[in-house]
Amino acid sequence: MTTTTIRRVCVTGATGKAGRGAVRELRDSGYDVLATDVAVGADGRVSGALRADLTDYGQAVEVLRGVDAVVHLANIPAPGMATPAITFNDNVAMNFNVFHAAASLGLARVVWASSETTLGLPFGHGPEQFPGAPGELRYAPVDEDHFPWPSTSYALSKVASETIAEQISRWSQIPFVGLRISNIMEPADYERFPSYWPDPHSRKWNLWGYVDVRDVALACRLGLEADVTGSSNVIVAAADTVMNRPSRDVLAEVFPDVTLTREVGEFETLLSIDRAASLLGYQPRYSWRDHVKAEEHE
């Protein structure tokens, strides 16, 4: 099935930060969007959204019936928001249900939210790094091959779900695009970035990475439109770091024993987006540097 047949798209997790952005991006690009979330009705942030609990397979089937593709963003979005068991069980159940329902209904494409945490975050966890320890940073820039290295039940739920996506894509022949999304920021969040600069250790946990919510939405749309087969997973991050110092210098200060595998630009992200660029055509459009006054980050 070609991408030209994708007209009606279900966005799950539509009331969340990424979901709201994806709904807006897709509607602005001419897609007919069915928005759904278990939290519909809480604040009315997405009009016309349908309430559905995707831990129930029957509800997953019902919300996907009649759409051409799904952008699946509904999950417990971070570690520590629920118990480890609930985080793992609910996320894996939601992901399996949506993936299997999409395959059973013959959808053309599944784009879904994996996570940067599959790569080993939080980096530098604990007083000392040693091979195999949680948070071991093996090289930089980190790419998709710095995997799987889950250190929380949340990260483990995403690793398990990437395996589920690969298995279902194989027998269904439906392309799956997993987005290993970095720490999502809205424009209002950028005002706190200067507070990170005095202590680079404060953001070492994800190598000073972030991504604008509007670029996450872009990646969701590109995932629908890219010419791909099988199951692919790509890092989605901003083109730069949260820091006002060169990336090489910050890395050398905090992780002096970690090797750079290639030259990096002055403020270039240390979460490599090269694969997202080559596979999806992803080029981030937004940076905190466009929002924070120049004198604040000189």
Model-identified regions with their sequence ranges:
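N-terminal Rossmann NAD(P)H-binding glycine-rich loop of SDR-like oxidoreductase domains
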Residues: 9-29
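Conserved glycine-rich Rossmann-like NAD(P)H-binding loop of the short-chain dehydrogenase/reductase
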Residues: 31-42
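NAD(P)H-binding glycine-rich loop region in Rossmannoid oxidoreductase-like domains
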Residues: 42, 52-93, 101
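Conserved Rossmann-fold NAD(P)-dependent oxidoreductase catalytic core, especially the SDR/UDP-sugar
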Residues: 97-151
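Active-site helix of classical SDR
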Residues: 153, 157-160
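Conserved beta-loop-beta element that borders a ligand/cofactor-binding pocket
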Residues: 162-187
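Alpha-helical substrate-binding/gating segment
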Residues: 184-201, 206-232
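C-terminal substrate-binding subdomain of Rossmann-fold SDR/epimerase-dehydratase oxidoreductases
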Residues: 214-298
